[in-house]
């Protein structure tokens, strides 16, 4: 992880336990971490708290991330949309439900654009 941080790399991690997530985010503040599944594997409220505490943490919304209507809107209302990334869990789960979650939640076009591509561009350093 030190090597990834020193080269300004992004580390995409499948969720494990909440204590492990907190520990890694705290111990590696300069490391860009992307966790899969916003509300799955450990609990939505814990993930919101991680986003609130650690600016180096991003979540993708794949598969278990938005399987409950209102999860995405509630997340944005609590911590903003700037560290939420569109993702799919393909081939485990097809992308249709993840796309629908963003399209059918009550989001602004700015929020949708950021989640679908703007946040990833910024994280990856890709200019528009």
Show the residue positions of the predicted features:
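Conserved, mostly hydrophobic/aromatic
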Residues: 4, 37, 59, 89, ...
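Aromatic-enriched hydrophobic runs in primary sequence
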Residues: 74-78, 89, 117-119
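Mid-to-C-terminal alpha-helical segments outside catalytic/metal-binding sites
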Residues: 81-83, 96-128
């Amino acid at each position: 992880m030190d090597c990834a941080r020193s080269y300004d790399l992004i580390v995409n991690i499948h969720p494990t336990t909440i204590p492990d997530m907190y520990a890694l985010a705290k111990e590696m503040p300069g490391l860009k971490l992307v966790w899969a599944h916003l509300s799955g594997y450990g609990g939505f409220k814990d993930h919101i708290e991680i986003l609130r505490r650690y600016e180096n943490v991003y979540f993708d919304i794949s598969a278990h991330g938005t399987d409950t209507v209102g999860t995405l809107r509630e997340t944005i209302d609590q911590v903003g949309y700037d560290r939420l990334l569109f993702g799919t869990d393909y081939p485990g789960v097809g992308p249709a439900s993840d796309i629908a979650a963003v399209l059918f939640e009550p989001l602004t076009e700015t929020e949708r654009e950021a989640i679908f591509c703007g946040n990833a561009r910024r994280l990856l350093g890709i200019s528009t």
